[in-house]
């Protein structure tokens, strides 16, 4: 409570984290490298979450890339102009997204003739994408 917190990344996890931090009495600065907040997020989810966040004094900084975290600040680079900005903060939360970890699938592909990776193991995305990839895999089973 009472801290200035930078949340780096504005996907759903970053926005939900922002909401909790706001509710706990913190001032939150949301930093997003993309030009828009919550890029690639379904607009219904984005609008719902932003409606809860915007009643607080949350700062949004789209188009900024995290360059460095210091003891009491974050240094950000504007993605268009390359200008650096220093924002004083007490805490930093990294919410930078996910990448699939599929080393097991790669190992199994060398041992078995038919291995299919589905869902977030092949590509991070939405639940609908994961279900669709699983359905496609099942339909290819002979």
Question: Where would I find each of the regions flagged by the language model?
Answer:
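General small-molecule cofactor/ligand-binding pocket signal
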Residues: 59-61, 116
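Acidic, Ser/Thr-rich peripheral helices and adjacent loops at domain boundaries
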Residues: 49-52, 92
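Short acidic, glycine/proline-enriched helix-loop-strand junctions
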Residues: 42-43, 49-50, 59
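A conserved amphipathic helix/loop scaffold
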Residues: 52-53, 57, 108
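A conserved short coil-to-beta-strand element within the FAD-binding core of flavoproteins
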Residues: 62-73
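Rossmann-like dinucleotide/flavin-binding elements
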Residues: 1-41, 77-91, 95-142
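Short, hinge-like loop/turn segments at secondary-structure boundaries
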Residues: 46-49, 134-136
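Residues that recognize and position ribonucleotide moieties
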Residues: 59, 67, 85-87
């Amino acid at each position: 409570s009472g801290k200035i917190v930078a949340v780096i990344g504005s996907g759903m996890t970053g926005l939900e984290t922002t909401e909790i931090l706001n509710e706990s009495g913190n001032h939150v600065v949301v930093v997003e490298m993309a030009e828009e907040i919550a890029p690639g997020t379904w607009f219904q989810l984005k609008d719902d979450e932003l409606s809860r966040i915007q009643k607080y004094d949350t700062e949004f900084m789209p188009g900024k890339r995290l360059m460095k975290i210091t003891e009491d600040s974050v240094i950000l680079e504007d993605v268009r102009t390359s200008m650096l900005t220093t924002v004083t903060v007490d805490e930093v939360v990294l919410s930078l997204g996910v990448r699939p970890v599929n080393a097991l699938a790669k190992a199994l592909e060398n041992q078995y003739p038919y291995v299919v990776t589905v869902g977030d193991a092949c590509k991070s995305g939405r639940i609908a994408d994961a279900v669709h990839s699983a359905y496609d895999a099942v339909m290819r089973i002979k």
